[in-house]
């Protein structure tokens, strides 16, 4: 007889006990991080075999849209720290601004073989045009599109972290609005935040120049808000 342990009351109760027990919780968290790193490294092998051919196509498409955009998170970190993609990275990250974002962007990326797979968003419907993160893929290479908001003084976006119970924690990250500039990366003029090192230090801390295999955004230094009930997810 086959038992579905994920719907078994004993298993679910044991899992809840272990996860909330102060002695066993750190062990479970360490195992979770180890699984995440192993999965990421496997994806990184595929990513690095193809990214040097695919990246110029994506940049060219972004340039054709006539909107402000920039590389961010791990893609920016690799560009500034290593002048290359991070060895253990398995996707790209781009930012656009909510005042220029439009839903038809998905059609534009479809023209180069990237289809929108799913998106994260805020549950609070009173917050308009804020908090979107979209995932695109051509089957091998993936990129995240973060929709930033901006004011005269600041820019901010939301990131989402899923726990083992599939609950999404929404994390608001904020930086000073310093504008954008272009740098040469992979032989291309690529937009980045002005003062990119300051942008990275705000996010990753003063040790941003030292590689760290495992990272999640709860470790960020520029969190302005964190909420375990506000994240939502949908397939597109």
Where do the protein language model's features map onto the residues?
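Terminal accessory/targeting
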Residues: 2-4, 17, 41, 211-213, ...
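Residues at the C-termini of beta-strands that transition into short coil/loop
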Residues: 73, 98, 149, 194
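Active-site nucleotide-donor binding segment shared across nucleotidyl transfer reactions
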Residues: 59-92
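Catalytic metal-binding acidic patch
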Residues: 83-105, 187
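Helical scaffold of the NTase/Pol beta-like nucleotidyltransferase catalytic core
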Residues: 6-71
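Conserved catalytic core of two-metal-ion nucleotidyltransferases
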Residues: 40-63, 110-190, 198-203, 214-236
């Amino acid at each position: 007889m086959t038992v579905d342990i994920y719907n078994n009351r004993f298993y679910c109760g044991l899992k809840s006990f272990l996860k909330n027990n102060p002695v066993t919780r750190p062990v479970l968290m360490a195992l979770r991080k180890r699984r995440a790193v192993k999965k990421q490294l496997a994806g990184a092998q595929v990513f690095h075999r193809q990214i040097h051919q695919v990246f110029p196509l994506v940049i060219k498409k972004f340039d054709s849209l006539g909107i402000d955009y920039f590389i961010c998170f791990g893609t920016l970190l690799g560009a500034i720290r290593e002048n290359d993609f991070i060895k253990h990275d398995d996707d790209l990250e781009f930012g656009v601004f909510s005042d220029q974002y439009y839903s038809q962007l998905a059609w534009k990326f479809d023209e180069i073989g990237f289809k929108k797979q799913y998106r994260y968003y805020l549950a609070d419907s009173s917050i308009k045009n804020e908090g979107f993160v979209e995932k695109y893929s051509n089957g091998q290479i993936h990129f995240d599109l973060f929709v930033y908001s901006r004011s005269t003084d600041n820019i901010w976006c939301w990131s989402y972290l899923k726990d083992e119970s599939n609950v999404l924690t929404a994390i608001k990250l904020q930086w000073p609005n310093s504008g954008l500039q272009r740098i040469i990366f992979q032989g291309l003029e690529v937009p980045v935040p002005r003062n990119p090192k300051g942008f990275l230090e705000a996010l990753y801390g003063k040790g941003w120049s030292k590689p760290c295999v495992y990272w999640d955004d709860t470790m960020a230094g520029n969190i302005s808000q964190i909420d375990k009930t506000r994240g939502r997810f949908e397939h597109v």
